[in-house]
Each structure stands twice: as structure tokens, then as C-alpha cells.
């Protein structure tokens, strides 16, 4: 197990750092970022961001049209209500870029940039959060950048909230009053959504690479590399450990009513009832470390593992089906209508779509 933990740590903690200084990065240096708007899947994978048709896996466009050695993409894209695709670079160019998929350059078949923010000092790993007319974007430089999405500026400015929180790798969460931010330096922050003041900050004793989530009980839940699931009062930051996991909780828990689903690096998958404070069933152990977040679907929960497998479980923890995709899976799958899209590493294809029974519908490999 010690060797397994070392391997996972090297891949996940080291890959982004390598990509940040590797100017013509190629695929496979880090886990890709994945998002969807219901019609297209958006994949951040090394030198390019790809837009892929969910119907047949066809490449619709890529950005940039030609490789730019200063740009490297691994952060999951964020889709705004007006259809812009926002993604940050982990390369030597630390830009946060908004792409307009409805305005395509006919010469390169790449979307034009709607705006760009260049004020960050380090690379982007987390997807930004859109709330009302603001964008809350956390950077590996330890700062929160708050951007106005309606200022009509092509070169964006930002309000900088200095958190001194080390590397910020996870998308912020909000309840409409505060924005919650997790950090690799063990800290959870709450920032007032209107004033941008830090309301509270708490040390968890372990790095927090995943996002905080809000439970049905109104409490905030956070998993950490201290191998604990922590419950917070969102208003005060008072917190307590509600579960000791066998090993590191790397990813963001999945929320389904009163239930939280999460995996750990030892390969355990758990279902926790926030109303009782107890596990719903004995943890299931699929086949390898779990660092991707679970995906809660209508009639099952999908769990992806480091072995390159996807497991579908019912809400009682029974395995319904398994699909061996290959490679390694560190990226949380995304739901898109009737299919689930998965982005593995170390495979010939970049994406695979699965139907509700785990059958492969299509795969995506970029055009030359």
C-alpha cells in the first residue's frame, strides 16, 4: 500500500507542477479536465481544449488552432449561463480565457476569445465558479480572483482576495452567502460572496485537494488527506470529524439527498448518511485507488478507479456492472443525457462514452 500511495502522490501532486514548466506539453503529463453543456463535452488535455459532440464523439473544434508552447490545459472548463467556455492555463502563460463557441475562426476552426485575464501568478488547476454576475477563480498562487462577468471588457481585471492558502486546486463552492475554498495547505476558507472578506478559515491537519460540498442538512462537508470527513457549520466554521476513512480522501464527495458518496486512496467506496452520522453500508472495495469523484446518476452511482475501470453501484452498494476502459482514471466522469463521458489516461483514445448499462457508445481521438 505504501508504494501505491507514493505512486498516486507522484502522479497527482507532481504532474501539474511538471506541466507548468513544460512548454510544448503533450498528452499524458497530468489528468485532464472535463465538463459538458449537455450538447458538447469539453476536454482540457495538454496543449488543447477540445469540443466533442456527445452524439457521436466527433471533434467540433479545438483551441488554440495551432499549438502555443506557453499554454497547457488541465483545469476543467466552466460553462457560463450565456454559453462561454472558461478555462485556465497551467503553462508558462497563466491566462484565464473565455472562449466563445458561437464565434469560430474560419481559418483555424478555433473559437475566438471573448476575454482574457492575465493577472494570476501561477497555474490554473481548478474550474472557476460562476455565481450570479461574478466569477470566483482560485489559482495555485494562493489567491482568489473575483471577476465581473458583465463589464464587457476583453482584458479582465479582478478583485484579488489574498488567502495565503498555498496551492488552490479545487473549484469553490457557494451557498449564496459565502464562497468556500479548500487548499493543499490544509485550510478551508469562507469568503463573503458580496464583500469578498474572509469570514473564517480553519486548519484540517491534511491537504484538501477536493471541493467542499453542501449537504441536505445545510452543513458543509470536506474530505482531506488527513483521512477524515469533516462537517462544518457554514456560518461559523465550527467543525467536527464525522468519519475516519481508511486512507486519504482525495476527491469531492458526491451528494444525493442525505447521502454523501466518496472514495479513498486505499480503494474503499463509502456511503455516509448525514442525517444519522453513520455509514449506510460497509465500504465497497472495487479494484484500485479512487481519486476521481463519484458521479450520482438517476438509478446508480458511478465509481472510476486508478485501474481504468468504471463500476456502477446501486444505492445499497451492490455492483450492477463493471466496464474495463483501460489506462488510469483520475478525472471525475460527467453525465450528459443518456451517456456518461470518461477521460482516462494512458489510452489511445482521449474520451469514451458509456450508456446506462456500461456499454461503450463511442470513443474520441483528436484529429491530426
Indicate where each model-derived feature is located:
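Sec-dependent bacterial lipoprotein signal peptides
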Residues: 1-19
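Extracytoplasmic/lumenal domain signature
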Residues: 21-30, 35-368
Amino acid at each position: 500500500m505504501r508504494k501505491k500511495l507514493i505512486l498516486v502522490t507522484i502522479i497527482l501532486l507532481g504532474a501539474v507542477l511538471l506541466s507548468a514548466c513544460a512548454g510544448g506539453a503533450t498528452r499524458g503529463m497530468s489528468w485532464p479536465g472535463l465538463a459538458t453543456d449537455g450538447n458538447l463535452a469539453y476536454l482540457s488535455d495538454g496543449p488543447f481544449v477540445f469540443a466533442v459532440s456527445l452524439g457521436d464523439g466527433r471533434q467540433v473544434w479545438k483551441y488554440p488552432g495551432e499549438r502555443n508552447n506557453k499554454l497547457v490545459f488541465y483545469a476543467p472548463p466552466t460553462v457560463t449561463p450565456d454559453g462561454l467556455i472558461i478555462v485556465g492555463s497551467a503553462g508558462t502563460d497563466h491566462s484565464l480565457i473565455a472562449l466563445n463557441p458561437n464565434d469560430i475562426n474560419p481559418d483555424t476552426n478555433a473559437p475566438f476569445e471573448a476575454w482574457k485575464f492575465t493577472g494570476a501568478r501561477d497555474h490554473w488547476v481548478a474550474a472557476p465558479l460562476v455565481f450570479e454576475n461574478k466569477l470566483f477563480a482560485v489559482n495555485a498562487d494562493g489567491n482568489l480572483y473575483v471577476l465581473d462577468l458583465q463589464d464587457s471588457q476583453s482584458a479582465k481585471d479582478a478583485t484579488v482576495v489574498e488567502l495565503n492558502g498555498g496551492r488552490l486546486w479545487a473549484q469553490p463552492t457557494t451557498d449564496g452567502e459565502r464562497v468556500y475554498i479548500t487548499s493543499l495547505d490544509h485550510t478551508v476558507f469562507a469568503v463573503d460572496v458580496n464583500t469578498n472578506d474572509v469570514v473564517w478559515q480553519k486548519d484540517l491537519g491534511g491537504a484538501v485537494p477536493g471541493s467542499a460540498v453542501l449537504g441536505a442538512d445545510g452543513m458543509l462537508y470536506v474530505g482531506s488527506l488527513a483521512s477524515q470527513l469533516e462537517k462544518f457549520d457554514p456560518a461559523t466554521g465550527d467543525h467536527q470529524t464525522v468519519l475516519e476513512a481508511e486512507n486519504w480522501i482525495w476527491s469531492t464527495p458526491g451528494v444525493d439527498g442525505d447521502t454523501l458518496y466518496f472514495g479513498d486512496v486505499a480503494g474503499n467506496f463509502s456511503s455516509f448518511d448525514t442525517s444519522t452520522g453513520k455509514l449506510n453500508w460497509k465500504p465497497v472495495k472495487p479494484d484500485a485507488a479512487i481519486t476521481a469523484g463519484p458521479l450520482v446518476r438517476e438509478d446508480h452511482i458511478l465509481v472510476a478507479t486508478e485501474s481504468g475501470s468504471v463500476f456502477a453501484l446501486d444505492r445499497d452498494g451492490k455492483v450492477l456492472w463493471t466496464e474495463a476502459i483501460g489506462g488510469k482514471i483520475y478525472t471525475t466522469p460527467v453525465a450528459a443525457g443518456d451517456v456518461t463521458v470518461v477521460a482516462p489516461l494512458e489510452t489511445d483514445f482521449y474520451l469514451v462514452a458509456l450508456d446506462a448499462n456500461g456499454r461503450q457508445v463511442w470513443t474520441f481521438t483528436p484529429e491530426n
